[in-house]
């Protein structure tokens, strides 16, 4: 059985500003750096052997901090990037026009052909993150990889493993530096292949998540 751990990047400046990131970027906040350190401590205890990260700055920095703690090399994979949010990237959510908010809500509410102008569809996102995950099956026997990616990307990955369509309503919360685990296995009681063991674990973090503070 192959265990793969999934980590969302640490809190960023644009997360705090409620700004749409997509494939644009902003640095980790001091809290985000601390979150990544706490993931690193957990990763060391889990016996992580490989770190594979999105090549965007916020995930690279998160991966670097984790790697320092567990002594792993990092491989960067652009297929783990966040959903391309097109013309809405860098915008604060509260500044969107009614039409622009409609584009964004299509992705949240589950619209099969939803796509922000200039961006990509959820199916395109799903195809590339699943391809990145499949590459883990080529790692040496006994490997225990950790993937560092993004909220929408990882939510789509976990949801589709559970059998939902890529464009399904977004109902899985993966907070900054949450840890999820998926396994590749043959089982008499579960469908063979990828299964979800845990999703969105934040028990290793010692401070409230940003979305809890913004309620």
Curated annotation (Swiss-Prot):
SUPFAM superfamilies: Phosphoglycerate mutase-like (SSF53254). The keyword Nucleus does not apply. It catalyses: (2R)-2-phosphoglycerate = (2R)-3-phosphoglycerate. Pathway: Carbohydrate degradation; glycolysis; pyruvate from D-glyceraldehyde 3-phosphate: step 3/5. One of its GO terms (biological process) is glycolytic process. The keyword Isomerase applies. Gene3D superfamilies: Phosphoglycerate mutase-like. GO terms for cellular component: cytoplasm. PROSITE patterns: PG_MUTASE. Keywords: Glycolysis, Isomerase. The record marks 150 as: Transition state stabilizer. It is an enzyme of class 5 (isomerase). Substrate binds at residues 8-15, 21-22, 58, 60, 82-85, 104-105, 151-152. The active site is at residues 9, 82. One of its GO terms (molecular function) is phosphatase activity. Its EC number is 5.4.2.-. Belongs to the phosphoglycerate mutase family. GpmB subfamily. This is Probable phosphoglycerate mutase GpmB.
